[in-house]
């Protein structure tokens, strides 16, 4: 699909809403000509404010609307530059070429952003307390929690845990401006 339709333009660093055009609708990996109420589908659009699952962070959720119809976006993933909106059609019929309005669940996005930033603060605090050998080995960032997997040769002591917690809390209280920087592996 990416070769035929081109990559999806991501607008989500500056907006939680956008207009878009449906490029394709997929059911079980195959393109279909339409989707109706009750269908579970993947919708590809030309541009989106929905952040796709990446680097341990879950994808955005929200709503897609058109005419007098809507779909609930239950997850967003990405492959080969295409953002895939996993959705359930609530009512109406959706067809490729349809103009739609996209609306990200803003309160959930804010919680995801906070936990994403917290992973960076936690990593730096761990390196300060335990040493430069600490490396991130994985993570899970959701709207309700984060998990941070890291390398260290032994269990942390209560004193080390308290020191890491104090550093992270001090940084949070600083309420520093957050800058978006796209990092490549």
Predicted features by range, described:
Residues 1-185:
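A glycine- and charged-residue-rich anion-binding loop/surface
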